[in-house]
Every structure is written in structure tokens, then in C-alpha cells.
Amino acid sequence: QNALVDGLLYDWLTKPFIRDCYSSVKGRGTSDGLARLKLFMGEYYRCHGAEGWVLKCDIHHYFDSIDQSDVLRRAERYVSDARVMALLAKYVRLTSHGLPLGLRTSQPLANLELCEIDHRIKEVYRCRYYGRYMDDFYIIHSDKAFLKELRREIEAGLAAIGLRLNDKTQIFPLAHGIEFLGFRTYMTDTGKVVRVLRQTAKTALKRGIKRYEAMYRAGAAHGEIQQSYRSRRAHLMQGNCRGLMLRCDAKMEDIFKEENMNE
């Protein structure tokens, strides 16, 4: 799978992706998605001020709901080797419906499924302030009525491929901030863009530290746990949460210190 994705599929399947598709694209990811949101908010403020609206969308049971035949038809437009296409179809058909979770081939295919909608939002509706990470996406606009109409268009486009928005989808004032990729990003009245950690992410971090402690007591390697924690820490430090991270650092040190004292 790794050789298939890295050696062949990646270039073929990512070719039609828009700039603001962040998942499973080299050089992008969550950090890029957050940076682009900050850029968009700054640009929006300079053009329109602090008043505006956000359409925030999420798709119901995305991976499980993707039509296998439809996504394979889309892939055929870009995969020029019949043998590779046959192997890709074999991976997709490992489950009776949707895309198999955990397979590397599923990530670019899931992105490809929404590619036409991406282009329609960007190029037909001319939405500059649009970003998507897999099935989580937002549009910032000055006109609430425009976003209501756009939501109907998105719903129709999704229905045509057997998908639908979930109940979390909503239109709300830009002043509320946008929850995206584990953070809430908002603008002050003066146009300063601020990023803070979501409460759910804080809770997940605390649970993660308890899990690290249990892993360490069960015999997991110190280096393995530290590597996992550093990766999570690097992502969370993109928000305004230095105090929280310092407390978590101290807790991690205590875990290793207590174990060493008991040896």
C-alpha cells in the first residue's frame, strides 16, 4: 500500500485538488489549514471589517457513506494504469460499503470524492475564504443569504453522490469564531486573529496523558511515549495555550520521575 500510494497514486489522485484541500497532501496538513484560516480572516477583515458570516459543514458518516463505484469512477479519470486501477479497486472492495478505515489508499480517495464540490465552491461561487480538511469545511462570506443558497447547492451536490451534511452544519456570525482542526480561531474588533484550543481538545489531552502514564507503567518505552507526546504538543502549541502545555510538560516529567524512583 505504501509503495502504491507514494510511488504512483499520490501524483495522479492529488492533481485535481484545490490549494485549500489540506488533508493527505504533502506540505499541507493541519498546520497549513490553520495558517490558511488565519490568512483568510486577516484578508477578510481588511476587505469587509469584523462583520460577516460562516457556513461550517461536516458530512454525516463520511467514510462509511462514500459510494465505492462513484469514487472508483472518479479515480479512473486520473489513474492511467489499468493494473494499478484494478489493485486500487481491490482495496476499496475490502468492505461492503464506503472506504475502509485505516488504509492509506482511502485518504486520497476520500479527498477526491469532494473535489468537484471544492472546484464549484471556489470557481463557480467565487468563494475565496474556503478551506476543507477531509469532510470538515468552512466558507466565510459577508452575505448570510448567499451562504443559505450555497448550503442548498452543497446539499444537492452531496445528495447526488449519496452523501449528506450532518446536524452540526450551521451558519453563524463570524464573531463567534470558527472551530477547525482542534482550535477555535476568531478575530477581535481590531482585526487581530487569535487561535485558542477547543475545550474538547483540552479534555482529550488530559486523557492522553493518563493513557501515557498507563502505557509507561505497563512497560512501554520512554522514547516511544515521548515521541508521541512531542508530536501532539507541537500541534497544540499552534494555539494560545502555553500555560496549559507547561503544566502538561510537568505532569509528563512527574510520570517518568515517579517510575524511576520506584525502580
Locate each region found by the language model.
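Right-hand nucleic-acid polymerase module
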Residues: 2, 91-94, 148-149, 165-263
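Conserved polymerase palm-domain catalytic core
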Residues: 35-134, 138-155, 163-168, 172-173, ...
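Generic structural signal for hydrophobic core residues of well-folded globular domains
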Residues: 7-8, 12, 91, 141, ...
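Electropositive, glycine- and tryptophan-enriched low-complexity nucleic-acid-binding patches
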Residues: 2, 6-22
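PAPS/PAP-binding and catalytic site of the sulfotransferase fold
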Residues: 4, 154, 158
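Residues immediately flanking
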Residues: 6, 57-59, 183
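Long, hydrophobic, well-ordered secondary-structure blocks that form the structural core
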Residues: 23-34
